Amino acid sequence: MIFSLILAAAAGTAAPAPGPVIALVAGEGASQCLPDHSLCLEVPPVEDGDASEAVLRVTSAGSAPASLPLPAFAAAETVALWPTLIRGKDEGGAPRYLVGVLSGQTSMYSGGGGSASQLHLLELRAAPGAARLGGEAIELPWDGSLMIRACFSEADMKDRMEACHDEYEYGAGLTAAASSGDAVFPTLAYRAVATAFPRTSRRSDDNSGTRLKRADLVRAEDPACSYDRVLRYDAATAHYELDQPLPDCSDYTVP
């Protein structure tokens, strides 16, 4: 996704610093594991595409796998594991994490289509042999990709220099922010980047009659939907709070 490319370019070849946001590694089959394989997770494919039947399969060292039902996510057509864990403070000696689940939707249009997903962070108490899911700490728009037909006549093709589809991309990432003090879960930094092609296109506008210039035929960031937010965990509500509300970027995040 576009955010991953931006992050990789900024990081160069430097090794990632250790911290509470842990990238999972491939385990047995389709499972994703902590680097030491002490905990492995999987969201198996659901039968008949029924996302309401999705479960989180948890395997700890020395314990039998447990299948924990996932909550129903509104409008979800697909459910997948986010390949990252966020480490919190242990509870009674048992590890505590936030596990990410991506719920997705797709739409098809005449001459185009789109997809999008949302990230749900759920509390996971991972005591060996007694794993259980808690509530949702936050839901965030995660990615979106849309292509919309914009030429309906030969005149449109000429006016748009044969760029006959508008393309919209949205990508986000989460990293650990500043020290979280005594908070149960770490403070997080959320960054979103949205782009449009051609650079003048906006999904909420009628772009079909727009006369484009050669300079418009580039992919450009939309500053209204490219932004940063800080997320702080509130133990009283068991929920993350944003430092500012999210802008309305449904042009990018709703297919």
Features from the language model and the residues they span:
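Solvent-exposed loop and beta-edge segments used for protein-protein assembly and interaction
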Residues: 91-95, 114, 180-184
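Acidic, small-residue rich beta-repeat scaffolds with periodic aromatic anchors
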Residues: 14-34, 124-255
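Sec-dependent N-terminal signal peptides
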Residues: 1-11
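Short N-terminal edge-element motif at the start of the domain
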Residues: 40-109
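Generic N-terminal initiation segments characterized by hydrophobic and/or small/turn-forming residues
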Residues: 2-4, 67, 130, 137
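Short coil-to-beta strand junction motifs in C2/discoidin
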Residues: 49-53, 113-119, 221-226
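Contiguous hydrophobic, core-forming segments of folded domains
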Residues: 97-101, 105-125, 132
